[in-house]
């Protein structure tokens, strides 16, 4: 089922009076509030595709004829929503919304969809597939990071079914974490692109999981990577962004990750050197939203995701600064303009965006990554 919806423009003035430590959440009924109605619309986007097998873009290396199988046989839990990582974060979307709206009209259908996917048998199939020695780089780091986010969301939900799903997912969670831990010490350079392989965004997701899971080893590896890759960075060329099919900002994603790792004073100093062009006079003109020319093109439609992720990254960066920092108004004003541009594009009209943009909308409107 494909359902479209329209979310009206939000005035930047809503944000300019906010503090950095907690950008003012939208109130009930405001245009971009994550209320029950909006949650229902976002949930329907995931429900429409979680078990829709085709069209499907698999990232599948075949070793022989026996590997020629349909997606549902290769990865029996996460075979819908066009690709593996979108299927994974579509499940995350439902879990996050169910935690906030457990009695909503969509709740029964969402629980049924999760129960259909997150069975021990299905997860065993996922472990078998991902554990193959020739698939060391499968969905690394983006898809694996989202898998850990799904696990973190389930871990934080005090619900009997959620506990069952979390237990079923544990072997795959452990495998994903192990693969990332094996990779991180060998990664000699950061990956600074605007698509899936980018390290900064995935590092943020993994960092947040490690805090929930209490995985000090993962936190230590990421802290070491921070020192090697990002601590000395200066003058990030934000003016060169975006590339034509970005859905993540290399500069903003790095800053949004670093505010997780550094203390507020250290982050403020680092940010001044890294993005010296953030105005101290307010306004949103310094970073206009990206322009989408064709939402039926799966790559060009990435810019809708860029606008969504920029919005939450800008809010996250502001959240990492002290309330009196003069850069906060400009950060939140730019976030507001990106919200206003991006949220109306989150519809099911075109599957090219409908299969994944709902997750980005929920990540933004639920203030994920800032708990």
Predicted feature descriptions by range:
Residues 27-79:
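Low-complexity, Ser/Thr/Pro/Gly-enriched N-terminal "stalk/linker" regions
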Residues 88, 97-210:
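Extended ligand-binding groove/face enriched in aromatic
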Residues 213-352, 356:
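Long, repeat-rich segments with strong aromatic
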Residues 27-34, 45-48, 88-104, 145-161, ...:
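Well-ordered alpha-helical scaffold segments within catalytic/enzyme domains
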Residues 1-6:
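N-terminal export leaders
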Residues 8-17:
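Bacterial N-terminal signal peptides
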Residues 16-28:
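Bacterial Sec-dependent signal peptides at the C-terminal "C-region" and cleavage site
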Residues 27, 31-36, 71-88, 128-145, ...:
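Solvent-exposed loop and edge beta-strand segments that line ligand/cofactor-binding
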């Amino acid at each position: 089922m494909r359902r479209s919806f329209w979310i009206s423009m939000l005035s930047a003035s809503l944000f300019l009076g906010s503090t950095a430590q907690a950008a003012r959440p939208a109130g009930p009924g405001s245009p971009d509030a994550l209320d029950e109605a909006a949650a229902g619309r976002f949930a329907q986007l995931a429900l429409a595709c979680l078990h829709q097998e085709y069209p499907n873009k698999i990232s599948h290396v075949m070793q022989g004829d026996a590997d020629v199988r349909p997606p549902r046989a290769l990865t029996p839990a996460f075979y819908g929503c066009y690709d593996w990582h979108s299927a994974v974060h579509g499940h995350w979307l439902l879990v996050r919304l169910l935690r906030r709206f457990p009695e909503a009209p969509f709740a029964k259908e969402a629980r049924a969809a999760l129960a259909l996917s997150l069975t021990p048998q299905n997860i065993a199939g996922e472990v078998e597939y991902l554990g193959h020695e020739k698939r060391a780089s499968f969905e690394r780091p983006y898809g694996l990071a989202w898998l850990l986010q799904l696990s973190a969301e389930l871990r934080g939900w005090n619900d009997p079914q959620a506990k069952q799903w979390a237990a079923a997912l544990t072997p795959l969670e452990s495998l994903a974490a192990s693969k990332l831990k094996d990779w991180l010490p060998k990664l000699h350079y950061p990956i600074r692109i605007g698509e899936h392989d980018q390290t900064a965004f995935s590092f943020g997701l993994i960092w947040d999981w490690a805090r929930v899971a209490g995985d000090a080893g993962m936190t230590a590896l990421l802290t070491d990577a921070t020192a090697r890759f990002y601590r000395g960075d200066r003058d990030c060329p934000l003016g060169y962004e975006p590339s034509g099919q970005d859905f993540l900002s290399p500069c903003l994603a790095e800053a949004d990750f670093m505010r997780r790792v550094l203390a507020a004073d250290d982050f403020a100093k680092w940010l001044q050197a890294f993005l010296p062009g953030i105005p101290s006079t307010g306004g949103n003109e310094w970073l206009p939203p990206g322009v989408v020319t064709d939402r039926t093109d799966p790559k060009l439609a990435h810019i809708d995701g860029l606008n969504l992720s920029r919005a939450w990254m800008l809010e996250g960066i502001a959240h990492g600064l002290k309330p009196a920092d003069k850069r906060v108004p400009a950060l939140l004003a730019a976030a507001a303009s990106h919200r206003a541009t991006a949220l109306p594009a989150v519809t099911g009209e075109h599957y090219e965006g409908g299969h994944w943009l709902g997750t980005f909308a929920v990540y933004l409107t639920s203030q994920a990554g800032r708990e």
